[in-house]
Amino acid sequence: MGQIKPKIELTSKQQLIFDEVKKSHFLKTSFYFTGGTALSSVYLHHRLSDDLDFFSEEKFDTLPIVNLMAEWGQRHQFKINSRELEVVRIFLLEFKDKEKLKVDFGYYPYKRLEQGRIIDSVKIDSLFDIAVNKLQTIHQRNNVKDFVDLYFLLQKFTVWDLMEGVKVKFRMELDPYTISAAYLKAEKFEDLPIMLVPLNLLELKNFYKDLAKKLGSSVVKK
């Protein structure tokens, strides 16, 4: 039997940009696809996700990307608003049907822990790396999408695995109390993103409340 080719499930506008990325030698060799949309479209298929995030471990010149995006805009008839925020070049695209799409190209100087998939010659961040990034993110910001993503990722990895991943990847220690406090922020959420698999807000809140208690009690026992 032949090897099953990895699949990616994107909206038509996301697929259009992904197809342009894979045609560019510069982009497909310099960047990898990551973030919530990579997580949902390649691995978990658990929720709708809007943005396309492409990261590079090396610093890069944004001018070639700006020029490419301008070419794509002419070819596919979308308007572009572009700005730079720290180390990320952000493109806000508006298509003729008024649908909008945000595409980011960012410098992310952290070596990936595992090799991810390759789809149509585009590198995809690994499931473990995305999970480690999510754990590192939730104690810095309070976005329900990150907590939903981590909810499903914690069905596949233990929090201890991810804590060790954060230590290796970011050279930082996340202690159990910090993570427990981050988990409890889920109590403030009022709604969920559009889900593709069953999950309700009460389940999400109870999940993190229970995890926070277990994590705290495990530290006390030690």
Predicted regions mapped to residue ranges:
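Compositionally biased terminal segments of proteins
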Residues: 1-222
